[in-house]
């Protein structure tokens, strides 16, 4: 059954999002906090994209992937943050059935695309460290473009499968989602249909895309560590370790929180705890990613310094 047909057959045409709290004082504090996180996410990721595009020294496969990661992080957080922030001003926080399905599809699609992109980035680092002389011939512009396109296509096709399996179900009420956006566990809990097949589909998608990506990342970083130990110069080892440490930090944060939420049975869902975890992987991680890469990356710092020096000259 398609999502449109499911919408027509369901007695529920819209959902009510409970958000975080009903206390006005806490709502004001949370609004300011989340607005600050979202604006920081936009500022840092956009700055990183423009910095990479504007500096020819950063026109390499590694930074091509990094600029796409920043773009995904902007879209990923934007699937949740704007709607969540406006909901603070409404007594009844409603979202249509189709709007809920669209939010879920876009959010999960961007999240799975990021998982696949991080796998491509790990392969890029492995090629750079293990075969530095052959690296330019291995990581060609065409291959990098195909890897990025493949990440988006794979992510959104997987998301389409997940969204179709959930929103084809019948929803007859209640329609109250005890969450701040249309995430999988709280939406699935509202269905009047048997959700076993949907849970199996979700498990298979998460294991196939997320689990396989995580396994490939572990294998890649195993080879990378082995290659780093063979680098003769201490400076070369330090530079390689610095770059890989940034990647590993991002991978651990994203996969750790996402797999925790999406690979558990719906019966183990705890509202308060899982809302905090959801805030972390939907809002905090997209803000931290550019900071992690920027603060530990000499080339990014040098490019930023050039921009600041240029502004001083023209001011």
UniProtKB/Swiss-Prot annotation:
Disulphide linkage map: 100-192
Extracellular topology ranges: 1-28, 83-103, 162-198, 263-275
GO cellular component, one term: plasma membrane
Pfam families hit by this protein: 7tm_4 (PF13853)
Subcellular location: Cell membrane
Glycosylation, residue list: 8
Keywords for the protein's UniProt record, in alphabetical order: Cell membrane, Disulfide bond, G-protein coupled receptor, Glycoprotein, Membrane, Olfaction, Receptor, Sensory transduction, Transducer, Transmembrane, Transmembrane helix
Membrane topology of the entry: Multi-pass membrane protein
GO molecular function, one term: G protein-coupled receptor activity
Topology, Cytoplasmic side: 53-60, 124-142, 223-239, 296-315
InterPro entries with a match to the protein in the record: GPCR_Rhodpsn, GPCR_Rhodpsn_7TM, Olfact_rcpt, Olfactory_GPCR
Main localization, broad class: membrane
Transmembrane segments: 29-52, 61-82, 104-123, 143-161, 199-222, 240-262, 276-295
Family statement: Belongs to the G-protein coupled receptor 1 family.
General function of this protein: Odorant receptor.
Name the UniProt record assigns to this protein: Olfactory receptor 5A1
Species, as recorded: Homo sapiens (Human)
């Amino acid at each position: 059954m398609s999502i449109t047909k499911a919408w027509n057959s369901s007695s529920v045409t819209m959902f009510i999002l409970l958000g975080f709290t009903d206390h006005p004082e806490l709502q004001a504090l949370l609004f300011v906090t989340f607005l600050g996180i979202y604006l920081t996410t936009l500022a840092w990721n956009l700055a990183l994209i423009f910095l990479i595009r504007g500096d020819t020294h950063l026109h390499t496969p590694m930074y091509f992937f990094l600029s796409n990661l920043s773009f995904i992080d902007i879209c990923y957080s934007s699937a949740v943050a704007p709607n969540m922030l406006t909901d603070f001003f409404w007594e009844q926080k409603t979202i249509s059935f189709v709007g809920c399905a669209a939010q879920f599809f876009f959010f999960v699609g961007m999240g799975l695309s990021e998982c696949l992109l991080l796998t491509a980035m790990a392969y890029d680092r492995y090629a750079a460290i293990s075969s530095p002389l052959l690296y330019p011939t291995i990581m060609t512009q065409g291959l990098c473009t195909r890897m990025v396109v493949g990440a988006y296509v794979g992510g959104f096709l997987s998301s389409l499968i997940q969204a179709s399996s959930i929103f084809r179900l019948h929803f007859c009420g209640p329609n109250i989602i005890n969450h701040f956006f249309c995430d999988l566990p709280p939406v699935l809990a509202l269905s009047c249909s048997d959700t076993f097949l949907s849970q199996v589909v979700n498990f298979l998608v998460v294991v196939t895309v997320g689990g396989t990506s995580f396994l490939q990342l572990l294998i890649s970083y195993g080879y990378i560590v082995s290659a780093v130990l063979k680098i003769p110069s201490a400076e070369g080892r330090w530079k390689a370790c610095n770059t890989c440490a940034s990647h590993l930090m991002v991978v651990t944060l994203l996969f750790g929180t996402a797999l925790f939420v999406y690979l558990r049975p719906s019966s183990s869902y705890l509202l308060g705890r899982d809302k905090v975890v959801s805030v972390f992987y939907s809002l905090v991680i997209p803000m931290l990613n550019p900071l992690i890469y920027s603060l530990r990356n000499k080339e990014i710092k040098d490019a930023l310094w050039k921009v600041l020096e240029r502004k001083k000259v023209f001011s």
